[in-house]
Amino acid sequence: MFSGASAINLDAKGRIAMPKRHREPLHAHHNSQLVITVDIQSPCLLLYPVQEWQQIAVKLSQLSDTQPAERAIKRMLLGYAHECELDGNGRILLPTPLRQYANLEKRAMLVGQLNKFELWDEAAWQQQIEESRIAILNEDLAANQRLADFSL
């Protein structure tokens, strides 16, 4: 399970170094293999351990090629999907189309989301956090069945 937000940098070749605390679990449980794709609702990338991605792929295979919305989701997620493996230094190369989609240039945030990571441009992440904070403050959490009993 992945959690926490880490500030990271892209090098001149478009590589990121996975934070050390995530390298060993990725190596031990996922053979250092990831699939990177786009988030269809936010300007960020999603990094899935390959086994997690296989579950997503099964769900995608059940979507219709004749329904425009379903086909669009498949096209985005599968079209951008890129398999990669951490190198000996714990780095992964982000292909140019993926970097462009998320506007990744130099400074980024890698955010653990239990079964996957999100990779954000640092400024976009800060903006998203502020928007989320405001949305939570303005939301009637008791009206949301799934959040009504949620407590920390």
UniProtKB/Swiss-Prot annotation:
SpoVT-AbrB domain span: 5-52, 81-124
GO CC annotations, alphabetized: cytoplasm; nucleoid
GO annotation, biological process: negative regulation of DNA-templated transcription initiation
Cellular location(s): Cytoplasm, Nucleoid
SUPFAM superfamilies tied to this protein: AbrB/MazE/MraZ-like (SSF89447)
Listed Gene3D superfamilies: Transcriptional regulator MraZ domain (3.40.1550.20)
Keyword Transcription regulation belongs to the record: yes
Pfam families assigned to the protein according to its UniProt record, in alphabetical order: MraZ
NCBIfam families tied to this protein: division/cell wall cluster transcriptional repressor MraZ
Name the record gives this protein: Transcriptional regulator MraZ
UniProt organism field: Shewanella piezotolerans (strain WP3 / JCM 13877)
